[in-house]
Amino acid sequence: MTLADLPRFSPRGLLRSGAERRAAAEQLRALNTVPDDPGRITRELSGGNQQKVVLARWLMHECRVLLLDEPTRGVDVGAKAEIYRVVTELSAAGIGVVVVSSELSELAGLCTRVLVMREGEVVAAVDGAAATEHELLRHAVAPTDTEPVLEEIK
């Protein structure tokens, strides 16, 4: 797959016009993907840029909700910052973003609300302002008999 395979206009991975190629290049530039050449083979990119290509692919579909599972695992600090910037902008634009992450600092910094799960059950809902690493970890490891389990999330 190349970077040009991103747009929703090319379901078989073949671009039909320069407009689609320009749209792919624009999305890659918006994510600061290096290089932003839509003809570049994705697997030749760094891990961080590969993650940004995957994100760009979904953004080209104009999704209203994104589910990001470990979006920054294995990427460098610069790519993490770029992904965080994009997630924050998407959320501010009204796009629903659900982030699944084992990095507590990531959740504390990105989320307006964090649901903490333990053994397949939601054990706490923490507002973004109160979502510190310490608070999230406290809920994640608290003994079940002393921590009430959420029955309903409103």
Where on the chain are the PLM-derived regions?
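Glycine-rich phosphate-binding loops of nucleotide-dependent enzymes
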Residues: 1-154
